[in-house]
A protein has these predicted regions:
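C-terminal motif of bacterial Sec signal peptides marking the signal peptidase cleavage site
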Residues: 4-7
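Auxiliary tRNA-acceptor-end handling modules of aminoacyl-tRNA synthetases
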Residues: 9-247
């Protein structure tokens, strides 16, 4: 004979809401998009650089405030690909610090080890670290890709403001010394670059690789640059390398 024991009371169902996890929240890791954007605005206000790449970075965040690198609670793996390119800019005659290499590497490490300051106003609080990564990754990406593709120096500005006219006593004008048609990065390029950052990894890596000049002399000059320590010769090589970027 079998006995079945049952309760006359109805089964009580348990519902779990987000509020039930509130006690598990750690303020050190508490971030929001609004607070990240607020810190990006602070970085923009203190950024006085007048390079075209940096102005493009500021323009993106001033107009759309769209996150390009930060995913849900992490940073895109494309950041590592970008850093691998920046780590080799010394072979092009540049300092890594011009592309924020040390800052970005350190902040990426902080994110991946959750090494944040507990005080929200501290320099290395989670919000400030994510804001720095978002802003300076974009600046580094545009500095590298725009510089490699179009040149790190604008030849129109560099050469057409040297020879001041003496016959114009009312206005400051200059004789044009550079008139060769040369492409410059515009808003269309900026939109393309931002879309590449948001896109898939293959296109991102391909975009970086194809940013370098197509001039066949470029590779020869780079090779020569890395074989000599003569300052005057290196200076001439760097000038010719830059000319290869003006297309």
């Amino acid at each position: 004979m079998a006995f079945v024991l049952c309760s006359c009371q109805k089964e009580e169902r348990m519902y779990v809401s987000l509020d039930d996890f509130a006690t598990l929240r750690t303020s050190r890791y508490d971030i929001s998009a609004d607070r990240v954007f607020s810190n990006i605005r602070t970085l923009i206000l203190s950024d006085k650089s007048n390079s075209l790449a940096d102005m493009h970075a500021r323009k993106h965040y001033n107009t759309s405030m769209e996150m390009l690198w930060i995913t849900r609670g992490d940073v895109s793996s494309k950041a590592d690909t970008l850093l691998s390119y920046i780590s080799r800019v010394d072979s092009l005659g540049f300092s890594r610090d011009k592309f924020y290499y040390s800052l970005l590497k350190e902040d990426l490490q902080r994110v991946r080890t959750l090494d944040f300051d507990s005080i929200k106003t501290a320099d290395n609080s989670a919000v400030k670290v994510f804001a720095r990564l978002e802003y300076y990754l974009t600046k580094a990406f545009l500095r590298y890709t725009e510089g490699q593709r179009f040149g790190f120096m604008n030849p129109y500005k560099a050469f057409n403001r040297l020879d001041q006219r003496k016959d114009d006593t009312l206005h400051v004008t200059y004789r044009s010394l550079y008139g060769w048609h040369t492409s410059l990065p515009n808003d269309t390029y900026l939109a393309t670059a931002c879309a590449v950052i948001k896109g898939d990894m293959d296109n991102f890596a391909d975009f970086l690789a194809k940013s370098k000049p197509h001039n066949p002399l470029y590779a020869k000059y780079i090779s020569a640059l890395n074989k000599t320590r003569d300052k005057d010769y290196r200076r001439r090589l760097l000038c010719n390398i830059e000319r290869c970027r003006w297309e």
